[in-house]
């Protein structure tokens, strides 16, 4: 035990010294190791003492290096050739495959197999066969490679085991088979539409030559490609519409809507599509649900009491509970018709018999007696928080223009209590200078009402319908 270190190896070091991290393994020269010498490999190849040795172990190392170099060159050449033959001319302008340098780096390198000590002559023909196969595959044209891959949806069962490429086939790892059997790869092989310009990856391209010798008939018994699944079914409240998959290929949604609903006007279809935010499925659901407006109108006209105003504040819940609950927006009813809950019965003398059913001049002779309490958030109850209804679609702008309502609420209380709603910004009442509500009944004396707003408050508010809609929606 001196200051220069102990010649012995102690397993347990002192407690105060932290344990050292294991050093990274540095590569050593294999030929020198065969002869019992440890040499660092970096910068050693030119000066190795055993570089010209022809013993059995050194020849085995030479042959192993040749086989690995031939495999790497073969895989690189296969990737380049198969990609050039697989990409059609229509997809050449799209973003191309990664460069072959990245492809060779991404391809998994075969691990060095530990072979027993044996004479090299059986190893030499395998390397020559691999190089000859690479040259043969590079020179042969492959016109049917694309058709063979398009006709096979299941790629995992189409591996060939030729004797010439046996050692090449064994070197592919499990990552390639998982990547080939994934549904995304099957989809990109199955249809080369402009919506799916996925280029075949490099690892799959290496298999194009091997799959070329297999059978190229399509597989109708595959569970993913049944004949009845060539159409996309969209369900609505009044029926279903089947969309063929050919409509989805590089076609704008407005054209698809014109194909499905030829009896609708293009402007109406465009408005519905804009209202749905460009979502084709939501627009189809809106158009499907608008078909049921006639039957809903007949059902509503059979009920004389179509507008019921309960006093507990839950407005229209009894009529809206019959709608089906769906999570998609605008799935029930059309935005271009009056909701069924707001249709007035036809036996009243002052109702125009048109689809909008707008009252003429005075549907309510005294609005303070019969307040129309409309909410913009009718679906915000705990039982069904996402209940779609027509009142939320048919916004309060039309109601404000027709019924001259300032906001969501007209106060049913007399004008002698203005301080009740004075501080509430959500419940403003309108000024009483409207000639509509100044017509009293014959038996009711006219009572002068106190104005709830001063002129300054009234001037500060904006009278545009857009700002009122923003206020009510907030």
From Swiss-Prot:
One MF term in the entry's GO annotations: metal ion binding
GO biological process entries: adult locomotory behavior; adult walking behavior; male sex differentiation; regulation of odontogenesis of dentin-containing tooth; regulation of transcription by RNA polymerase II; transmission of nerve impulse; ventral spinal cord interneuron specification
InterPro entries for the chain: DM_DNA-bd, DM_DNA-bd_sf, DMA, DMRT, UBA-like_sf
Domain DMA: 251-286
Pfam families with a match to the protein in the record: DM, DMA
GO cellular component terms given for this protein: nucleus
Comp. bias intervals (Basic and acidic residues): 172-181, 218-228
Function: Probable transcription factor that plays a role in configuring the spinal circuits controlling stride in vertebrates. Involved in neuronal specification within a specific subdivision of spinal cord neurons and in the development of a coordinated locomotor network controlling limb movements. May regulate transcription during sexual development.
Additional note from the record: DMRT3 is a marker for a subset of spinal cord neurons (dI6).
Protein name: Doublesex and mab-3 related transcription factor 3
Lineage: Eukaryota, Metazoa, Chordata, Craniata, Vertebrata
Gene assigned in the entry: DMRT3
């Amino acid at each position: 035990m001196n200051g220069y270190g102990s010649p012995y190896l102690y397993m347990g070091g002192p407690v105060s010294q932290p344990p050292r991290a294991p050093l990274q393994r540095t590569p050593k020269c294999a030929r020198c190791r065969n002869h019992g010498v440890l040499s660092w490999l970096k910068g050693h190849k030119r000066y190795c003492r055993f570089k010209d040795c022809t013993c059995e172990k050194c020849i085995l190392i030479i042959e192993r290096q040749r086989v690995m170099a031939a495999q790497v060159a073969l895989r690189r050449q296969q990737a380049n050739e198969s990609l050039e033959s697989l990409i059609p001319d229509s997809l050449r302008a799209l973003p191309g495959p990664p460069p072959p340098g990245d492809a060779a780096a991404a391809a998994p390198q075969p691990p060095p197999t530990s072979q027993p000590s044996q004479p090299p002559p059986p190893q030499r023909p395998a390397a020559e066969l691999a190089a000859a196969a690479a040259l043969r595959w590079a020179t042969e044209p492959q016109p049917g490679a694309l058709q063979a891959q398009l006709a096979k949806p299941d790629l995992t069962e189409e591996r060939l085991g030729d004797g010439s490429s046996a050692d090449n086939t064994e070197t592919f790892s499990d990552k390639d088979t998982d990547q080939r059997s994934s549904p995304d790869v099957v989809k990109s092989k199955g249809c080369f539409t402009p919506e799916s310009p996925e280029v075949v990856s490099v690892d799959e391209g290496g298999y194009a030559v091997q799959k070329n010798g297999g059978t190229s008939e399509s597989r109708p018994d595959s569970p993913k490609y049944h004949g009845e699944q060539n159409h996309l079914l969209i369900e609505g409240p009044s029926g279903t519409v089947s969309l063929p998959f050919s409509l989805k290929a590089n076609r704008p949604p407005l054209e698809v809507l014109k194909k499905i609903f030829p009896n609708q006007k293009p402007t109406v279809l465009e408005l519905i599509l804009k209202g749905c935010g460009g979502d084709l499925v939501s627009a189809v659901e809106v158009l499907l649900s608008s078909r049921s407006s006639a039957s809903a109108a007949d059902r509503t006209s059979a009920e004389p009491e179509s507008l019921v105003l309960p006093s507990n504040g839950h407005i229209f819940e009894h009529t809206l509970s019959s709608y089906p609950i769906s999570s998609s927006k605008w799935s029930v009813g059309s935005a271009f018709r009056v909701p069924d809950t707001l249709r007035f019965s036809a036996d009243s003398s002052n109702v125009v018999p048109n689809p909008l059913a707008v009252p003429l001049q005075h549907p309510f002779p005294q609005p303070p007696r019969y307040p129309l309490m409309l909410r913009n958030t009718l679906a915000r109850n705990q039982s069904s928080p996402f209940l779609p209804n027509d009142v939320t679609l048919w916004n309060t702008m039309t109601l404000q223009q027709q019924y001259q309502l300032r906001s969501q609420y007209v106060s049913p209380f007399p004008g002698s209590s203005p301080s009740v709603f004075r501080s509430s910004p959500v419940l403003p009442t309108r000024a009483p200078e409207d000639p509509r509500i100044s017509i009293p009944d014959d038996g009711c004396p006219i009572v002068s009402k106190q104005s709830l707003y001063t002129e300054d408050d009234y001037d500060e508010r904006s009278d545009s319908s857009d700002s009122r809609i923003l206020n009510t929606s907030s």
